[in-house]
A protein has these predicted regions:
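Accessory carbohydrate-recognition regions in carbohydrate-active enzymes
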Residues: 24-167
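Intrinsic disorder/low-complexity segments enriched in polar/small residues
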Residues: 4, 23-24
Length: 167
């Protein structure tokens, strides 16, 4: 009887110990970075003068959602409600002009070529930003995800069914 009790006690203790051990979630320091911090800037007052850059360390370029018009130094402003494209940039700050820049904008439905008209409504609740990736689902159901490479970017676009699709 004593041997059975000892066996049951050892097995019970092992089960209790196993249930207490939790798997540690692996976080990298980069997972604590919020690229949207500092993006609520205006011409009158700066709250950071940043944009949500997606890049790799020492990469040749950055990628960012673009809420401002082409030619505007204010590429992304948190208070805007339209995304006009996803911009390849070399711009380190809104105070320094950019060069060699272009935008890519996936659209569904009606094709709009004018950058002033092609903005698509979005909500920050449908936006995910990290230093290594950005994704947004637009009000029309179109979803765009991007990740940077050392010399470019990889896009994944999910279009709504039964609508015209453009990039």
């Amino acid at each position: 009887m004593r041997k059975n009790f000892s066996t049951i006690l050892i097995v019970g203790a092992a089960l209790l110990l196993a249930s207490c051990v939790q798997q540690k979630e692996s976080f990298s320091p980069v997972d604590y970075v919020n690229p949207l911090m500092g993006t609520e800037s205006t011409y009158a007052f700066s709250h950071g003068n940043t944009y949500p850059a997606v890049a790799v360390p020492w990469g040749m370029n950055f990628w960012s959602p673009q809420t401002g018009e082409n030619g505007s130094g204010w590429m992304y402003t948190y208070t805007d409600s339209l995304i006009r494209g996803f911009r390849q940039t070399h711009q380190p700050s809104p105070w320094i002009n950019d060069y060699g820049t272009f935008s890519i904008m996936p659209l569904s439905g009606v094709l709009k070529m004018d950058h002033k008209e092609r903005g698509v409504p979005f909500s920050h609740t449908q936006e995910e930003a990290a230093p290594y990736s950005y994704s947004v689902t637009f009000a029309d159901g179109l979803r765009t995800e991007l990740s940077a490479t050392s010399r470019g970017a990889v896009f994944e676009v999910t279009f709504p069914q039964d609508s015209a699709q453009y990039i």
